[in-house]
Amino acid sequence: MLKTFSIGGVHPHENKLSAHQPIITAEVPAKAVILLGQHIGAPAKPVVAKGDVVKVGTKIAEPAGFVSAAIHSSVSGKVAKIDTIVDASGYAKPAIFIDVEGDEWEETIDRSATLVKECELPAEEIVKKIADAGIVGLGGACFPTQVKLCPPPSFKAECVIINAVECEIGRAHV
C-alpha cells in the first residue's frame, strides 16, 4: 500500500529496491530515438535530415514556437530517419532516429572542470544562450526556461536564482 500525505504526494516504498544492487555501466545503444516533444508546448522542428552525421551536442531540432525548446543529440552517429514513434503516453510523436557510431562530441562544448562563476553578458544574450541550449525545467512539464525568463516589459527582475538540482530526490540519489 502506498503511503500518502495530507499535503499531497505519493511516496512509493519501491524507490529503494535497488539500494543493494551494484551500479553498472550501461552499454551505448546501436540505435537512438530522440523525441522532438520532450517539453511542454510545440514539438521542436528538425534541422537535420536523413544521412546527416551528428555528434553529441549537435543541435538536431529548433524551437517551433515561443513555448518550445531546442533539442541536441545525446549520441554521435548518422541520422537514419525522421519519423513518428509511439511514446509512453501511447500517442505517436515525431522523433529523430540515429544509428549510433562512436562517441564524438561537438568541439564547441566546454567540457573543462572550471566553473564560470560570474557572467557579464546582457540579459537578452543570456536568455538567447539558454534558448539555444534547449534548457527546460525538470519539474514534470519540462517547461522551456527561456519562456520563464521573458516576463512582460512592465516586470523587472533584479536577479535570477537558478536551482540546478534534480527535484525528485529519490531519482537523484543512489
Where do the model's predicted regions map?
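Well-ordered secondary-structure scaffolds
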Residues: 1-170
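Conserved small/polar residues in nucleotide/adenosyl-binding loops
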Residues: 172-174
